[in-house]
Amino acid sequence: MSMSDTLGDMLTRIRNGQSANKAVVEAPASRFRGNVLDVLKREGYIRNFSKFEKRPGIHEFKIELKYFEGKPVISEIKRLSTPGRRVYSSIKNLQKTYNGLGISILSTPRGVMSDNEARAAHVGGEVLCQVF
């Protein structure tokens, strides 16, 4: 049976890995999930990620989680737009996450970006998740 929400699965793996104080978690690879991980890395929520071949033709990401003074950098990671309920926002209606302390990750016509980058580029789109 195929998985319906692959991004939600990856975010849950990150959340569970940080709850268990893991240094590294693995998640199935795709270009879209790689773009989301790139935003998380740029914003400083994960240390790094790399793609590797688990079996011939099967690629996965190795995600290095980030901690500060023994505590996870990500306090909360929440999926907003799901396959059953899409959430879209124009740039005017895009709310700041936790008064600007967190970020929202958006899928826009110009690619996957954080809410700050979307405001600078003046584009709205699908609100994928919030990270705090």
What is each model feature region?
Residues 1-132:
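Core subunits and conserved enzymes of cellular information-processing
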